[in-house]
Amino acid sequence: GTFYSLNTFYIASPDKDNSKTLNKALADGKNILFTPGIYNIEETLKVTKKDTIIYGMGLATLEASKGNVVMNVSDEDGIKVCGLLFDAGEKESTTLLQVGDKKTKVSHGNNPLSFSDVYFRVGGGKYAGKVKNCVTINSNNVIGDNFWVWRADHSTNVGWDVNTATNGIIINGDNVTMYGLFVEHFKEYQTIWNGENGKLFFYQSELPYDVPKQKAYKSHNGKVNGYASIKVADSVKKFESYGIGVYCYNRDSDIDITSAVEVPDRKGVKLHNTCTVKLNGQGQISHIINKSGTATENLGDACRIREYENGIIIQ
């Protein structure tokens, strides 16, 4: 590991700090250490300098209080963010964490950006949170380790038209690697992966419990039942996953989900050990990957594909 003097950090406290004080510290070249508590973020926190460290203690919570992006991380080498909960506010945000303003050809292969133990919540607490998409990754060579991205399915301020959130995470950058990605209960695709050469190690996803009717949950311009949990873009040439689990509990209606995972059928797009499980409720997941794999028709059904590439499966 690397030693960093505490003198290089601005020590943040929810009792004294706001977006202005935090952004000033960042502009001055300080790392940020968030002490435990809830921070009302009224303006986007701008992490613009390479090798900046943003570190949260005790699950420090950053709340979007005015429909803003909570944190924008610039397309710079070596930025590290860890130990934070991003909370959607009452007014809809476009995203809570944005990494890079847009897709570029800039490589960070020698000094990747990294995000560890970061959590995202939409509803289930003080507010009926609203966001279009929790996490947007545009930069290349990003490493993610333990992301929990959650639209609330229980507790207070929860409902299909209450705590609204379309997607959990959208990955546009190339050479992005995720270790332990958990994405649950969003209203359309949980995860959209548009970048090339993505690698995913362990993915867990529950589809939304609270779909009111099949008509409200159809993809591909209403032609396909349900939304896959992971949608790898048709344009992607290389992608590889190890250990995907997608779970359904259609609590409120009899819902069919055509596929748990959608990927382009071509060599170079490889999936290892993919499974679906019916936890409870009505309906089913009809296929595991695209139109391959058996349906989860009965309570407790677990269906698996051991290897998949270019439409060829090994059970």
Q: What is the role of each PLM region?
A:
Residues 1-315:
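Extracellular/periplasmic carbohydrate-active domains that bind, remodel
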